[in-house]
Design a protein with these regions (language model features):
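Hydrophobic anchor at the beta1->P-loop junction of P-loop NTPases
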Residues: 38
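Extreme N-terminal, non-catalytic leader segments
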Residues: 1-34, 68, 74-76
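P-loop (Walker A) phosphate-binding loop of NTP-binding proteins
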Residues: 41
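A glycine- and Lys/Arg-enriched "phosphate-lid" helix/loop adjacent to the NTP-binding pocket
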Residues: 143-220
Length: 231
């Protein structure tokens, strides 16, 4: 069972080959490799925390959140996807018309994250003994925090939520992603809202504090409730 640990609020500011099932998609099969997911609210300081970790040791490798895919921006080393060729900033579309785009965004966010987290590790990482790979969020928070919050707030219908849960469970059973631990960057909703305004990401300028409060409650329930189990 993966370990969970919470980090208190600090001063943080703001063509690769896919591994085939035959190679066991769970890359923790690499000897000595540890896989840790860093979780937290929007603007909790995850990117800064991960950058500091990466700079602190050559044994640390970071898989960042694929947000550029959601913004329709071609990031270095990635090919342009069919959705990008069609145009559209899906992150912005979700924030502007959440009920219309909730299912589309939550589906694509999870699938793009899954793709990023299943890429074959660089040789220098895979060959290094006792290395650790840190992930900016996981497919578990995609479901248990963001998608579930959309359902609870009425942005996802019962039918959409049931379909989401069905394919999400199937993918995790078919493409196992084991995590050895979860690090939770616990930050107050007010602080994350202030940081979000400060960093000035255009899509986030109208995000309400109440939305961050709801996400905070979901993180607390998932990561700090000892009775809760990942499904």
């Amino acid at each position: 069972m993966a370990k969970r640990c919470a980090a208190g609020e600090g001063e943080l500011q703001g063509n690769e080959e896919m591994i085939s099932p035959a190679k066991k998609l769970c890359t923790s099969a690499v000897s000595g490799l540890r896989r840790i997911a860093v979780e937290g609210n929007i603007a909790a300081g995850k990117s800064t925390f991960l950058r500091l970790l990466k700079e602190s040791s050559p044994a640390y490798h970071v898989i960042s959140e694929p947000i550029t895919k959601w913004q329709n921006v071609d990031s270095p080393g990635d090919s342009v996807t069919a959705s990008q060729q069609c145009g559209g900033n899906l992150l912005d579309m979700f924030y502007r018309e959440p009920k219309r785009w909730a299912y589309t965004f939550q589906t694509y966010a999870c699938l793009s994250r899954l793709k990023a987290q299943l890429r074959q590790l660089p040789q220098e990482v895979a060959s290094q003994p006792n290395s650790t790979i840190f992930f900016e969020r996981s497919v578990h928070s995609d479901k248990l925090v963001f998608a579930e919050n959309c359902h609870d707030s009425g942005l996802l219908s019962d039918v959409e939520w049931n379909i989401y849960c069905d394919w999400h469970s199937f993918l995790l059973e078919s493409l196992p992603l084991h995590f050895d631990a979860f690090i939770y960057l616990k930050t107050t909703p007010q602080t994350t809202w202030e940081r979000m305004q400060k960093r000035g990401r255009p899509e986030e300028q109208d995000v309400a504090l109440d939305y961050l409060k709801s996400l905070h409650e979901k993180h607390e329930k998932w990561l700090l409730d000892s009775e809760n189990k990942m499904k």
